[in-house]
């Protein structure tokens, strides 16, 4: 299945044919029999996705996260992306009368550009019901859109010393406790507030901070809600805008990995394929860290790797972008022929 991801195969017949056309290479990999699509299909539908879940987390934990950080330590973005499915082929994932779909919920390490934690649900699962399931540890900082607004969870975050940066809902009721001055020209408001709504005040009875920031490129103003008081308003606004990195990640994997078309129709097959796809991305990141420098982005990496999967070459030299040595043959008859 990882081969099908990298080689951008369509259906199970395609990887079956292409793998069997390289039998000598498969022999050196320990595969002594022909690859059968029935075998792949059976494994895809019956092998528990928890196996690939453990592989994903094992590889994720092995990646180096000690590089240079743009933001504070343990800073994560939380978001979800929906994958549309055919209602007729995937009836188990129905969430509208005419549509099926699944949703990938992801915790993303913004400083290191790495997925950290994920789970997959039916597409009708709303974000504000999943925030408490995102496996956020004490002392971490998370940023997410206002679709995740859940005042009870915000209260739990304050109790557990988990820091968050999100957007304030327009209808939120609160009273101002203190106004703060800011020398940043892009910060129009900075204040400490307390919720006064009957439900919000009970669920989150802690002082919070509201910041209004104007984007210097678009001129759009956003209202940010956070429980961080020891950082500047401009820095916190930058933390919220860094949430866009997770959107770029989703766009990248959708363009370069097969997670919009599936090889199997069962829930097990869909979840397995998604986890294997993200494991392929982690393998890319591991290779990038092992090289002296990462000379290829993920798009270039995938487009070049799929045409040389069965070639014997030094991956580290190739990945770092070292050009092949020029070999001169004085008796090159081909050159003489075309001279």
Question: Which sequence ranges carry the predicted segments?
Answer:
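Major-groove recognition helix of helix-turn-helix-like DNA-binding domains
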Residues: 28-47
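DNA-recognition alpha helix
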Residues: 11-29
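A glycine- and small-aliphatic-rich helix-loop capping segment at beta-alpha/alpha-beta transitions
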Residues: 93
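Single, function-defining residue in the core of a domain
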Residues: 1-14, 44-47, 54-55, 70-74, ...
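Hydrophobic alpha-helical packing residues
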Residues: 19-22, 59, 253
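Short Lys/Arg-enriched helix C-cap and helix-to-coil transition segments
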Residues: 51-62
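A short, well-structured juxtamembrane/interface segment
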Residues: 60-67, 127-128
């Amino acid at each position: 299945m990882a081969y099908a991801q990298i080689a951008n195969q369509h259906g199970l017949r395609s990887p079956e044919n292409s793998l069997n056309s390289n039998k000598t290479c498969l022999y050196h990999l320990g595969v002594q029999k022909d690859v059968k699509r029935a075998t792949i299909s059976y494994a895809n539908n019956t092998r528990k996705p928890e196996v690939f879940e453990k592989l994903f987390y094992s590889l994720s934990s092995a990646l180096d996260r000690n590089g240079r950080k743009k933001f504070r330590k343990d800073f994560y973005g939380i978001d979800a992306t929906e994958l549309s499915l055919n209602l007729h082929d995937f009836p188990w994932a129905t969430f509208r009368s005419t549509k099926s779909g699944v949703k990938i919920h992801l915790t993303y390490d913004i400083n290191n550009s790495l997925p950290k934690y994920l789970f997959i649900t039916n597409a009708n699962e709303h974000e504000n019901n999943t925030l408490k399931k995102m496996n956020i540890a004490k002392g971490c900082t998370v940023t997410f859109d206002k679709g995740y607004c859940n005042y009870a969870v915000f209260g739990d975050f304050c109790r557990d010393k988990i820091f968050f940066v999100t957007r304030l809902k327009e209808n939120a009721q609160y009273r101002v406790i203190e106004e703060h001055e800011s020398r940043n020209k892009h910060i129009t408001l900075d204040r400490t507030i307390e919720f006064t709504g009957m439900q919000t005040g009970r669920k989150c009875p802690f002082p919070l901070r509201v910041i209004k920031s104007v984007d210097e490129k678009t001129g759009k103003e956003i209202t940010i809600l956070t429980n961080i008081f020891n950082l500047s308003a401009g820095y916190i606004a930058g933390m919220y805008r860094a949430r866009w990195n997770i959107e770029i990640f989703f766009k990248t994997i959708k363009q370069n990995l097969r997670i919009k078309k599936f090889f199997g129709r069962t829930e097990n097959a869909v979840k397995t394929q998604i986890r294997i796809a993200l494991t392929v991305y982690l393998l890319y990141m591991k290779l990038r860290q092992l090289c002296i420098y990462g000379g290829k982005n993920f798009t270039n990496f995938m487009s070049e790797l799929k045409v040389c999967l069965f070639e014997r070459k030094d991956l580290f030299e190739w990945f770092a972008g070292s050009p092949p040595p020029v070999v001169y043959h004085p008796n090159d008859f081909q050159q003489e022929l075309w001279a």
